[in-house]
Amino acid sequence: NDDQLATVISHEVAHALARHGAERVTQGMIQQGVGLIGSVAVAATAPQYQNAFNQAYGLGSNLGVMLPYGRMQESEADEIGIYLMHKAGYNVNEATKFWENMSEGKSGGNDFFSTHPSSQNRTKDIQTVINKIGNEAK
């Protein structure tokens, strides 16, 4: 339906408004720069550990920084998207239905290894935003 389509469109517009693409590029450049500096330092002092460092740094920086940052951006886009839907006159309650429909047939999964919040957390957080909008309107 139109309201659920607005959920997707407003979510993607929110990514653009929040400049998530630019943030991702910056984060990636920082990650690579720090990794390069670390790799050079290890190569200069203990070259036998350079490969191990590179693998550990790559895994650690992705799990510890990049994935959580991506989940935060997704949650932020969800929240901004709900406000955009509300301002445009769409039924924001359809957003939770949309994300529930999207999660059908998928396992619950673990946020830790994902770029997106779990469906359960996502719908809970979206409902919180919807409730906040309802309270602000009163």
List each language-model region with its residue ranges.
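A Zn2+-metalloprotease active-site environment signal
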Residues: 1-138
